[in-house]
Regions:
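Domain-edge interaction signal
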Residues: 1-201
C-alpha cells in the first residue's frame, strides 16, 4: 500500500482521480481495466508530462522491473485492498486477475487545462491497447526503461526473466537533460513538492 506519510493529500486526490478518469474512458468502450493497464498508463502519463512540460504529473518513483516501469507504491496499493486510494477506486479479482473500477465520478479539481488535455490524449491513444502492448511500448529501444536497464547492466537479465524486479530508479529528468528550461522547471517542481512534504511532517 502507499505510505500515508509520503504523499500529500493533493497528490493522492490527483492520482485517485486520474485512475478514475482512465477507468471511465476504458469502461465506456467496454474495455476491462486491469492493474497492469493502469500501472503502465500512469507511467506513460508521467513520462510524456516530463518530456512535454518538464513537470512530473504525479511525482511517483518508477523502478525497472521485467514487466515494465513500475511504481512500487502504486503496485502494492492496487495488489491489495486500497488504503489511501480507497475513496477513489474499487479492486476486484476475477480468475486471479486484478481489475480496477471507479468508486465515484471523476473530479477535475486537481488538474489544470494542460493536464486534462494530456489525460485525454493518453486515454485516446492507448484506449484499445492490451496490457502486453503497453508493456512493449514502454520497453521499446531508447525508452527510459530500456536505457536505464541497459545503463545498469540488467537489460539481458530482465528480458530473459532471470531477474523480475530491481530497485533501480528510472530518472525521467534524464530525458530532458539537454533542455535547460524544462530541466529547471522539473527541479523547481521537485523542490516545491519536497518542501510541501516537509511542512506536512
Amino acid at each position: 500500500m502507499i505510505k500515508a506519510d509520503f504523499y500529500t493529500k493533493n497528490q493522492i486526490a490527483k492520482l485517485g482521480n486520474a485512475l478514475i478518469f482512465l477507468c471511465e474512458k476504458m469502461q465506456a468502450v467496454n474495455e476491462p481495466v486491469s492493474k497492469t493497464h493502469l500501472l503502465k498508463l500512469v507511467f506513460i502519463i508521467e513520462e510524456i508530462s516530463v518530456k512535454k512540460y518538464g513537470i512530473p504529473f504525479f511525482d511517483l518513483r518508477f523502478d525497472v522491473w521485467k514487466l515494465g516501469p513500475v511504481s512500487k507504491d502504486l503496485f502494492y496499493e492496487l495488489s491489495e485492498e486500497p488504503t489511501l486510494l480507497s475513496d477513489y477506486i474499487i479492486r476486484e479479482v476475477t480468475n486471479g486477475n486484478i481489475y480496477i473500477k471507479p468508486k465515484k465520478s471523476f473530479s477535475d479539481d486537481e488538474f489544470n487545462d494542460n493536464e486534462i488535455a494530456l489525460l485525454e490524449q493518453i486515454s485516446e491513444r492507448f484506449l484499445y491497447c492490451t496490457a502486453g502492448e503497453l508493456i512493449n511500448h514502454t520497453h521499446k529501444k531508447d525508452s527510459p526503461w530500456y536505457n536505464t536497464a541497459y545503463k545498469h547492466g540488467v537489460l539481458d537479465l530482465l528480458e530473459s526473466g532471470a531477474k523480475t524486479t530491481t530497485d533501480i530508479e528510472i530518472k525521467l529528468c534524464e530525458s530532458i537533460e539537454n533542455d535547460k528550461e524544462k530541466l529547471a522547471l522539473y527541479r523547481s517542481h521537485k523542490d516545491f513538492l519536497a518542501q510541501s512534504k516537509t511542512l506536512k511532517s
